[in-house]
Amino acid sequence: MYHWIGTYDGPIRPLVEQAYSLVPGASREGYCTVHDFSVGTQYAPIFQQIIPGHWVRSFLSIIWHNGTIPPHIDTDMREDAIRSHVVLDTNAECWYLHDGQWQQLQTGGVYRMDPLKIHASVNWGHGARIHLVVDTN
């Protein structure tokens, strides 16, 4: 289950626009991840209060309209790392599966989850679902 740890109360729209600017010229179908170095440098100063610790890895996870991230386990996760998700954009038709439980997350919410448990996401809505994903230790 994703566990709520806080809320980002600042302006979300500039962060969403920044996320779109980092997306390579993709077809905007299915899902994509952006592992650009600039993700951490651009977002860490904003979220350091909510997500403390050393940012080991950060990336954007985007699911386009009618896209899915199939059930999986992140086997490349460091044992000492903690994974947080910042929901930059979502809609009422986005659902998250974690360890057998489905739930919906809220825009601006910051959540922790265990990536070593089976998880997946679907976006049946019309807009994109964008998360900033941060691993800390």
Ranges and model annotations:
Residues M1-G53:
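Non-heme Fe(II)/2-oxoglutarate
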Residues P70-H72, C94-Y96, M113-D114, I118-H126, ...:
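Short beta-strand His + acidic residue motifs that chelate non-heme Fe in jelly-roll/DSBH
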Residues H65-G67, T107-G108, L116:
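Tight coil/turn sites that cap or link beta-strands
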Residues I62-W64, M77-C94:
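Short, conserved beta-strand element in jelly-roll/cupin
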Residues V87-T107:
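A short beta-strand-loop-beta hairpin characteristic of the jelly-roll/cupin
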Residues F47-T68:
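A short glycine-rich, His/Asp/Glu-containing loop-to-beta-strand
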Residues W55-V56, I69-R83:
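A short beta-loop-beta micro-motif enriched in histidine and acidic residues
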Residues I82-V87, V110-R112, H126-N137:
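A short hydrophobic beta-strand segment most commonly corresponding to one strand
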